[in-house]
């Protein structure tokens, strides 16, 4: 997910998206531990998406 897409969303949408991504990351980690995960780079991509979302949330809160 690109930062420009994330930046356009409202604060509530971002918080919902953050929750979804955290659940997705949890699921990916479980798949990794049970040897079911084929694309191990998905964990890194999801972590980066979470960081982008957190950055956008902080930016919106600072702006008011």
UniProtKB/Swiss-Prot annotation:
The name this protein goes by in its record = Large ribosomal subunit protein uL29
Output the GO biological process annotations, alphabetical, semicolon-separated.
translation
- Biological source species: Nitratiruptor sp. (strain SB155-2)
Q: Which NCBIfam families does UniProt cross-reference here? A: L29
- Molecular function GO labels: structural constituent of ribosome
Q: Which PANTHER family match?
A: 60S RIBOSOMAL PROTEIN L35/50S RIBOSOMAL PROTEIN L29, LARGE RIBOSOMAL SUBUNIT PROTEIN UL29C
Q: Which UniProt keywords apply?
A: Ribonucleoprotein, Ribosomal protein
GO cellular component terms, alphabetically, are: cytosolic large ribosomal subunit
One Pfam family named in its UniProt record? Ribosomal_L29
Give the family this protein belongs to, as stated in its UniProt record: Belongs to the universal ribosomal protein uL29 family.
The protein's matches in Gene3D superfamilies, at most eight in alphabetical order, are given as: 1.10.287.310
Q: In its keyword annotation, does this UniProt entry include Lyase?
A: no
